[in-house]
Amino acid sequence: MRNLAWKSFWGVGLCVGTLGLCALPSGCGGGRHVSQEREESNLKPLAIFYGRFIGQHRGRPPASEKELKEFIQAAGTKELAGFHVTDVDSLFISSRDQKPYVVLYGNDARAGKATVVAYEQEGKGGTRFIANDLGNVQEVDEAHFREMVPGAQ
């Protein structure tokens, strides 16, 4: 009798555990959308090209939007297609707030460490995407944004 009770307990535990594992993927999907949106934003390839510019110009950041756009255009259509980019100008516009990104050029950019090089003007829902010259994009609230970009307007 005792053996039968143990088998029943084990069977119930196995069922509950399996149901719990099945529920995990669907229960934690909220952050996945934000992460996917961040990774697919125009800001990521823009920041990667910015970092490549620094790497190919002895640590000097681009002096202007024109200089960065010319550098990106020179990469060629195959390189751009790798980022799903067909129009260089579209890289400079946020798909979330439909405004041009603020990009730090010349003396405003500090190469040599992973530093913020571009960010959304307004963002969405009280958060903004910011990017560093390594191509990392983060979604931050206003307080964290002010810490990371103290001179922002």
Map each language-model feature to its residues.
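Conserved hydrophobic/amphipathic alpha-helical signal-anchor segments
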Residues: 27-97, 102-107, 137-153
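Short, hydrophobic/aromatic-rich segments at coil-to-beta transitions
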Residues: 112-117
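Short loop/turn motifs at secondary-structure junctions and domain boundaries
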Residues: 119-123
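Short loop/turn microsegments at loop-to-beta-strand junctions
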Residues: 125-127
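Sec-dependent bacterial lipoprotein signal peptides
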Residues: 1-26
